[in-house]
C-alpha cells in the first residue's frame, strides 16, 4: 500500500511517484490492467466505478453492446460510433480514456465536446472514476484541474469545447469527439479539417454521437465509413475513409422492450424516435448488394420503399 503523503490535502488524488508496498495480488492486477490487448476490458470490469443518480457509487458492468463498443474504441485507430440516446457511450469512453492515459505512457488525449457543459461533465465523470480507483492501479497526478489532468507517466488529458481551432497545434495520441453530430456544421467541418493533420503521426480518433441530421460532418464520416466493399464486392473491415463503424440501437439494451419503445414513441413522436433511438434518418446511406453481386447505395427512405 502507498505510504507517502498525499498532495492537495486529500486522499482522493494519488501523489506523483509514490512508493508502493506491493503484494502478489496487487502486482497481478496491475499487470492485467497493463495488458495491451485485454487490459481495457479488465480495467473497466474491475476498477472502473461510476456515479449512479440514485444508487451512488457502483461498479461499471458492461452490456454486450458496450463490450463491442469498447472493442471498437481499442482495436481500431479510427472508429465512428452511432448510438441511440442513453446507451452509455460516453460512460464507456470515459473508462477507456482513463485506462489509456494511465497505461499508455506519454499520451496526449483531447476530449472535444459539443458544448462547455459537455466537456465539464465528461471530465467530472473521469475525475470521479480516477478518485475512487485503488492507488496500486492508478497513476499519480502531477496536476489536477477541472479541465485537465497530467499524470506522472507523462500522459495528460484535456477537455475543451469543440471550436474551429480546438486541438490545433497539439500532437495528439487520442482524440475523443463526443456528440459530434450536434456541433454546428460550419464549426464541425473546420474543426475536422484542422484536427486531422494532428493525427497524422499515428494518433487515434474516437467519434461518438446520436444522429442529428443527414448532412453534418458526423453523418459524412459515418457514411464514408460504411462504404465497406472492395472492387471485387468483398466486405472490408474499414470504410473508404479508414474508419471502423459501430452502431447500437435501443433494443440492444437489455432493460428496454417494446413497452418502453411504445411509451417513448408516444412521448417524442415516430420521426424523432427513429432518429434518436433507431439511429436512422431519411437520407442516411446504406450499401446493398443484389443477387448478381452488384453494389449500390440507397437512402434509408428508399430502402423502406423497397421493402
Regions found by a protein language model. Give the residues of each.
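Phosphate/NTP-binding elements of NTP-utilizing enzymes
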Residues: 2-283, 289-307
Amino acid at each position: 500500500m502507498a505510504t507517502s503523503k498525499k498532495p492537495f490535502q486529500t486522499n482522493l488524488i494519488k501523489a506523483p511517484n509514490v512508493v508502493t508496498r506491493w503484494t502478489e495480488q496487487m502486482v497481478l492486477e496491475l499487470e492485467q490492467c497493463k495488458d495491451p490487448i485485454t487490459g481495457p476490458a479488465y480495467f473497466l470490469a474491475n476498477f472502473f466505478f461510476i456515479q449512479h443518480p440514485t444508487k451512488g457509487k457502483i461498479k461499471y458492468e458492461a452490456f454486450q453492446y458496450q463490450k463491442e463498443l469498447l472493442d471498437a474504441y481499442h482495436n481500431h485507430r479510427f472508429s465512428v460510433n452511432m448510438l441511440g440516446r442513453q446507451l452509455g457511450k460516453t460512460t464507456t469512453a470515459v473508462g477507456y480514456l482513463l485506462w489509456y492515459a494511465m497505461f499508455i505512457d506519454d499520451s496526449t488525449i483531447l476530449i472535444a465536446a459539443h458544448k462547455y457543459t459537455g466537456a465539464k461533465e465528461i471530465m467530472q465523470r473521469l475525475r470521479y472514476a480516477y478518485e475512487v480507483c485503488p492507488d496500486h492501479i492508478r497513476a499519480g497526478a502531477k496536476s489536477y484541474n477541472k479541465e485537465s489532468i497530467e499524470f506522472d507517466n507523462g500522459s495528460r488529458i484535456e477537455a475543451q469545447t469543440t471550436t474551429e481551432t480546438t486541438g490545433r497545434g497539439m500532437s495528439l495520441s487520442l482524440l475523443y469527439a463526443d456528440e459530434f453530430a450536434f456541433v454546428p456544421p460550419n464549426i464541425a467541418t473546420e474543426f475536422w479539417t484542422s484536427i486531422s493533420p494532428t493525427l497524422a503521426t499515428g494518433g487515434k480518433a474516437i467519434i461518438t454521437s446520436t444522429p442529428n441530421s443527414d448532412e453534418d460532418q458526423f453523418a459524412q464520416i459515418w457514411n464514408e465509413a460504411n462504404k465497406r466493399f472492395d472492387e471485387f464486392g468483398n466486405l472490408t473491415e474499414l470504410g473508404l475513409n479508414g474508419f471502423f463503424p459501430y452502431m447500437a440501437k435501443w433494443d440492444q439494451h437489455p432493460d428496454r422492450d417494446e413497452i418502453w419503445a411504445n411509451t417513448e414513441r408516444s412521448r417524442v413522436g415516430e420521426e424523432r424516435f427513429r432518429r434518436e433511438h433507431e439511429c436512422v434518418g431519411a437520407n442516411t446511406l446504406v450499401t446493398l448488394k443484389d443477387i448478381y453481386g452488384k453494389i449500390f447505395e440507397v437512402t434509408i427512405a428508399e430502402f423502406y420503399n423497397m421493402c
